[in-house]
Amino acid sequence: MIRFILGRLVKAVFILLAILVFNFLLIHAAPGDPAAVMAGEAGAADEKFLADLRARFGLDQPLYMQLWLYIKGAVQLDLGYSFRQQMPVAEMIGDRLPATLLLTGVAFVLSLVLGVTAGVAASARQGRWGDTLISTFALLFYATPLFWVALMATLVFSVWLEWLPGFGYSTIGAGYTGMAHVLDVAKHLVLPASTLGLFFTAIYMRMTRASMLEVSRLDFVKTARAKGLTRGVIQRRHILRNALLPVITLAGLQAGQIFGGAILTETVFAWPGIGRLMFEAINQRDYNVILGVFYISAAMVLLFNLITDVIYVIVDPRIRLTT
């Protein structure tokens, strides 16, 4: 297992390096002069001031040298300096990352638990009203745009009913500490986490249902029924364990989509995470922040995929541990 994990880590390093190079070249291929943006308005500053800015941020060097310096800094977690916020990018991301991990983590667990549970329930009631009802809701959640769900959730539960706060990480100026602070954050987390998780709940539900029905038709399940095992035992020990394999694979692949969905969710709910930081950086053309968020997001996705591979091996020991 250790050799397997080390092999995956080596591959992840090379993949991350390729992502760094691609994102760097993509950002620098965009039209516009970063130095002019730093000056406040394009063309508003004289050439000497723009030249000083280019020299300060290394923009006067050849592209290959800028790329080398960026990769060298990224290895040391030195992601550059934000000219807009006047602070290191690594510090900015470090301040925002816990909020994003909390949001995406809760949304991921919520969607996985609800999706698998609903999928199992639907497969057990195939062709009946329960299956139809669950499948209809899953299709509805899957087809509805995320931003519309976020806006409607805010309008209904925050504006009309006033049950839940519609924006922010915690109550401004409340000064809560200890358990009171935890409960306050949890209350603010309900709407964004539920909104982000609904789409993925529908995906996991549909995948679990289809996988459960497929596995239930295999020979070993028929053998288990012939031995007189109860329906619950067959569902839990034989069908569900094998049906979860494609769900686990899908969950690992969609880690990046959850981070992508966090950008929109955090923007609508004013959640202070790296998704909102990315949105602000794009509007301000703060290139170092954009590259820094790309870097951290790619690293997190690769980490999730590694965890998925390990879980896959644990769930199905028949899989060979090859690097």
Regions found by a protein language model. Name each.
Residues 2-3, 16, 97-130, 146, ...:
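Alpha-helical transmembrane segments of integral membrane proteins
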Residues 16-68, 161-182:
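Hydrophobic alpha-helical transmembrane segments of membrane transport/permease proteins
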Residues 30, 38, 42, 74-75, ...:
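Hydrophobic aliphatic residues
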